[in-house]
UniProtKB/Swiss-Prot annotation:
The lineage of its organism: Eukaryota, Viridiplantae, Streptophyta, Embryophyta, Tracheophyta. Belongs to the senescence regulator S40 family. GO terms for cellular component: cytoplasm. PANTHER family: EXPRESSED PROTEIN, PROTEIN S40-1. This is Protein S40-1. Signal peptide: none annotated. One of its GO terms (biological process) is response to bacterium.
Length: 140
């Protein structure tokens, strides 16, 4: 690479680089972007020769080829499409569900074996076996 660029020149550039066409037939150099510094030097050299009242020549305007084309209008929908159909049931908050299960003895504490204890040895293998049985990987 003969010339180094700053990151701001590449990523945050305010200019579009038009494609330079050459007549020599070299395909790699045919579609090479025009360098920003070359453009600015050409404009600066031309403008330095002219008087300050003469306007600068307008740069070749190029537009992005990735602009979206023929975007359909968004179809606005009614609330009926987004409504949740819960069958008329009333929602019960999760903390009430947990409280009811703890009172009735239905709450499962498969990994909670005590305060501050970690699962080791026989306790760990029991938990592992119960999980494998519940998931169907181990038959009872």
């Amino acid at each position: 690479m003969s010339e180094e660029f700053d990151e701001s020149e590449i990523i945050f550039s305010d200019n579009y680089f038009p494609i330079r066409r050459r007549e020599d037939g070299n395909e790699k150099e045919n579609n090479r972007p025009v360098d920003f510094r070359e453009n600015s030097e050409r404009v600066w050299n031309k403008s330095s020769r002219r008087s300050k009242t003469t306007p600068l020549p307008s740069a070749v305007t190029a537009f992005s080829s990735s602009l979206p084309v023929n975007i359909p209008m968004r179809r606005y929908s009614t609330e009926e499409e987004y409504s949740d159909d819960d069958g008329g049931r009333k929602m019960i908050p999760p903390h009430l569900i947990v409280g009811r299960r703890m009172e009735g003895g239905q709450m499962a504490f498969s990994v909670c074996t005590g305060n501050g204890r970690t699962l080791k040895g026989r306790d760990l293998s029991r938990v592992r076996n119960s999980v494998l049985k519940l998931t169907g990987f181990l038959e009872a």
